[in-house]
């Protein structure tokens, strides 16, 4: 057996799976090393993919030729679009998945990917020669050689779990931690730190009084994650349930705080701000009388339920006693308690936008080891790292995404430019070009780039082109078709909008909030015929195309304005400054700016402007020095 590869990926979580699939599908001889082949793509916390901004990332992964969207659609047991009451820039898909089927779907895809081999083992050392990674050594004493390595070790690096005052080494419940690897990397000058995350109890459904909870149903419309017309949701669609904590629950939780590792000094690491434990909630918001809980199924047939909103590392008896004070949980039986876990991460400002280390050539980092939290954030990073590892092996320009191209671009730019001091989670508010980064048009933004790269296949590219042509046909018809008051006013009144006083173009009527493409098409036969003609080549995705067309029509002004702003700022992206200045010697820069610029060494003026502590006056100094 030959232990020489183009690309080796360490860790088979969400980042590792995407990285390995991308590198192999692009043609690199790839090896994915995992501690347990039965946990490939494991959903370590909640059994769900997507959510606010995260759903857009999954759509982008799919548009680029990644796998997460396909796996999610195949294993979804409930699907919803979040933020429906807001504009389309905020719409975010989310799916509950069957946890076990999710793992096997990923494994099936990876095992049947050409150029990809899977090896079960634990990596304990990287081999570095002259500042370049050349291989690794495993606990079994196997030496691998590689042109590039992608580290996606998740929470396993020196992982330590906590339940009350009990501590147990591990990367996940009942799974061993990975030792020696952090130290092997750090000795080459790469800085690292510690972070913390947590997960809630898992509950036996047979012990729950569901009649005392509210139900939360999914949506059974055309929406899904993948843009491919072969992707379907075929599993049984299930309910979720909601309920609330109360003062009695909070009283018991407060009594347990002296034994809470978060409050007794046992855990020093920082946890995710936007996914706090239940004990953090009651301390931070002491006046809040209740907190909402979501009970989510772990699979199509299992009795195991996930209690979203009750992450905890309190002693197990406190967790159970508190939950018993919720009426629906009065007879609760759990499979395992909630727990917290501390783990190592590496400072992401030591990375290029390609996710390659600035310190060790051909070593890439992706996922939770970069200080992020979330399957989707990990998957997006893994995809980019896998692509660029392949490019480093075979030559070519690094593949990066700009902030106006993708949420993945925002994510990576934030990491490498600003760094992290707590687990990073993506939100729509982090993106300044939200209307350009909608969930409906990720294929329009990214598939062509992925096609020319070689990752998006011909069938995906043709689907994108067909959709693009249909959108152009519908929008152009609406711009040019004239409407006469006598022919449309009765319909407008029925639809609850003001009648026309004079003729206008159809697009002006479609801009009204009460009007949709489908309800006006019922009254305009020529438009109905045009819609049928435009979507004839892709009738399976007709609803998706009509939704995208309506968004383009109603929000075109906002889209154009945001694109114009992005293009203006793009001029600063074209001014390259990496390696041009000795920042420490430029006295006209502020002290903080000098320190930050030396540390980050930004690629462009635009990136420099996004570094915290670098002021507009500092940017003006750099512009003058650049001859601008």
From Swiss-Prot:
Q: Where, per UniProt, does this protein localize? A: Cytoplasm
Q: Do you know which PROSITE patterns this protein is assigned to?
A: GIDA_1, GIDA_2
Q: Gene3D superfamilies from the entry?
A: FAD/NAD(P)-binding domain (3.50.50.60), GidA associated domain, C-terminal subdomain (1.10.150.570), tRNA uridine 5-carboxymethylaminomethyl modification enzyme MnmG/GidA (1.10.10.1800)
InterPro entries, A to Z: FAD/NAD-bd_sf (IPR036188), GIDA_C_N (IPR049312), MnmG (IPR004416), MnmG-rel (IPR002218), MnmG-rel_CS (IPR020595), MnmG_C (IPR026904), MnmG_C_subdom (IPR047001), MnmG_C_subdom_sf (IPR044920)
Q: Name the UniProt key words of this record, in alphabetical order.
A: Cytoplasm, FAD, Flavoprotein, NAD, tRNA processing
Q: Which family does it belong to?
A: Belongs to the MnmG family.
Q: What is this protein called?
A: tRNA uridine 5-carboxymethylaminomethyl modification enzyme MnmG
Instruction: State the organism's lineage.
Output: Bacteria, Pseudomonadati, Bacteroidota, Bacteroidia, Bacteroidales
């Amino acid at each position: 057996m030959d232990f020489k590869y183009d690309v080796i990926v360490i860790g088979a979580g969400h980042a590792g799976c995407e990285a390995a699939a991308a590198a192999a599908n692009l043609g690199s001889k790839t090896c994915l090393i995992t501690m347990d082949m039965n946990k490939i793509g494991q959903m370590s916390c909640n059994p769900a993919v997507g959510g606010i901004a995260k759903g857009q990332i999954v759509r982008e992964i799919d548009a680029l030729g990644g796998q997460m969207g396909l796996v999610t659609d195949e294993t979804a047991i409930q699907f919803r679009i979040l933020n429906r009451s807001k504009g389309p820039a905020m719409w975010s898909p989310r799916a509950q998945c069957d946890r076990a089927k999710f793992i096997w779907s990923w494994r099936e895809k990876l095992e049947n990917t050409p150029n990809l081999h899977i090896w079960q083992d634990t990596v304990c050392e990287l081999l570095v020669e002259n500042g370049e990674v050349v291989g690794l050594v495993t606990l079994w004493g196997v030496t691998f050689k590689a042109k590039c390595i992608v580290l996606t070790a998740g929470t396993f690096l020196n992982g330590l779990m906590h339940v009350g005052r009990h501590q147990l080494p591990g990367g996940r419940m009942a799974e061993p931690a990975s030792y020696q690897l952090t130290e092997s990397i750090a000795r080459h000058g790469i800085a690292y730190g510690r972070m913390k995350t947590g997960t809630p109890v898992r509950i036996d459904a047979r012990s729950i009084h569901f009649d005392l909870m509210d139900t939360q149903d999914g949506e059974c419309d055309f929406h899904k994650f993948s843009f491919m017309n072969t992707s379907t949701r075929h599993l049984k669609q299930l309910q979720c349930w909601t309920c609330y904590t109360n003062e009695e629950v909070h009283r018991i939780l407060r009594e347990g705080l002296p034994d809470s590792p978060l409050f007794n000094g046992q855990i020093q690491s920082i946890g995710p701000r936007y996914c706090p434990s239940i004990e953090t909630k009651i301390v931070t918001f002491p006046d809040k009388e209740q907190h909402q809980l979501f009970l989510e199924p772990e699979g199509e047939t299992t009795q195991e339920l996930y209690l979203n909103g009750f992450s905890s590392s309190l002693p197990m008896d406190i967790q159970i006693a508190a939950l018993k004070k919720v009426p629906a949980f009065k007879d609760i039986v759990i499979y395992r308690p909630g727990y917290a876990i501390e783990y190592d991460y590496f400072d992401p400002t030591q990375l290029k936008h390609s996710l390659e280390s600035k310190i060790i050539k051909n070593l890439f980092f992706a996922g939770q080891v970069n200080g992020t939290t979330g399957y989707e954030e990990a998957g997006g990073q893994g995809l980019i790292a896998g692509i660029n590892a392949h490019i480093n092996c075979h030559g070519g320009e690094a593949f990066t995404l700009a902030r106006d191209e993708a949420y993945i671009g925002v994510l990576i730019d934030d990491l490498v430019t600003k760094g992290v001091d707590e687990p990073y989670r993506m939100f729509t508010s982090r993106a300044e070009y939200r209307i350009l980064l909608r969930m409906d048009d990720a294929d329009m933004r990214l598939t062509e780039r992925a096609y020319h790269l070689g990752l998006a296949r011909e069938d995906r590219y043709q689907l994108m082109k067909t959709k693009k042509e249909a959108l152009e046909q519908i929008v152009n018809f609406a711009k040019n078709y004239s409407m006469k008051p006598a022919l449309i006013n009765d319909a407008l009144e029925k639809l609850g909008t003001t009648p026309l006083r004079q003729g206008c173009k159809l697009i002006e009527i479609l801009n009204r909030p009460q009007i949709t493409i489908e309800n006006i098409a019922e009254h305009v036969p020529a438009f109905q015929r045009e819609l049928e003609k435009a979507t004839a080549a892709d009738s399976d995705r007709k609803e998706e195309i009509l939704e995208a067309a309506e968004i383009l029509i109603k929000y075109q002004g906002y889209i154009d304005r945001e694109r114009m702003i992005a293009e203006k700022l793009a001029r600063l992206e074209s001014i390259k400054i990496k390696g041009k200045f000795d920042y420490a010697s430029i006295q006209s820069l502020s002290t903080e700016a000098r320190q930050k610029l030396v540390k980050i060494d930004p690629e462009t003026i635009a990136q420099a402007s996004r570094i915290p502590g670098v002021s507009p006056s500092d940017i003006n100094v750099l512009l003058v020095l650049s001859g601008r």
